[in-house]
Amino acid sequence: MDNNKIMIVGTGNVGASIAYALINQRTAVNEIVLTDIIAHDAEGEAMDLRDALAVAPSYVKIKNGTYKDAKDCDVVVITAGAAQKPGESRMDLLKKNANILQGMIEQIMDSGFNGIFLVVTNPMDVMTYLTMKYSGLPAEKVIGSGTVLDSARLRTRIASYLNVNPKSVHAYQIGEHGDTELTLWSLADTGGQKVTTMLKKDIRNGISDFVKNKAYDIIDKKALLTMVLPLV
């Protein structure tokens, strides 16, 4: 990164959690700009996060701003959009969030931004494609969060069956971040052993289904998912 400056668009639970994670990990980031369609929400989050700097492991400049501040940002993280509600699939959000996205991307590009977009907003795969389309940036400059969250859930679930630390499990969900995602069992291992030799097929199938539906279960219970993605 040239300026070590990141903009987070959307200061709801996910956006705020990403900002919080950045100031609590020793990263290369030295400036965070928060922006939201509700300007005073971004201002309030910036004020709250600045107070945390007194006890954070490193100093990061934090401010609220507008899309114009994207001009010299290295990365713009897109978290803005309607949140998934109980009973909704990620694809149910498409029309609402696609409409929000286009105007947002156009304003960011008007600032002169030429960095990298990191897209978190659901349905993430489609929103990542639309960000590339609306921005005109090459594919290597528009990145989705992918199945990194799903893979973390997979490792945790496998670890619970094998009674090991999730960090010692190497396993991946692939494909869409959504209902068609798949578990790459052939590469899953822990401690040098293939998971397929330790867990029967019916258990593995149950784990795959559990991981695929985990988001719906969490949303039914607490409405929002904010803990894992900011850390990964």
Feature names for model-found ranges:
Residues 90-155:
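Rossmann-like NAD(P)(H) cofactor-binding subdomain of soluble oxidoreductases
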Residues 20-24, 51, 106, 133, ...:
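Short, well-ordered alpha-helices that flank and scaffold nucleotide-derived cofactor binding pockets
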Residues 74-77:
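N-terminal Rossmann-like NAD(P) cofactor-binding module of classical short-chain dehydrogenase/reductase
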Residues 1-43:
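NAD(P)+-binding Rossmann beta1-loop-alpha1 motif at the extreme N-terminus of oxidoreductases
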Residues 135-141, 150-232:
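C-terminal substrate-binding/catalytic lobe of Rossmann-fold NAD(P)-dependent dehydrogenases
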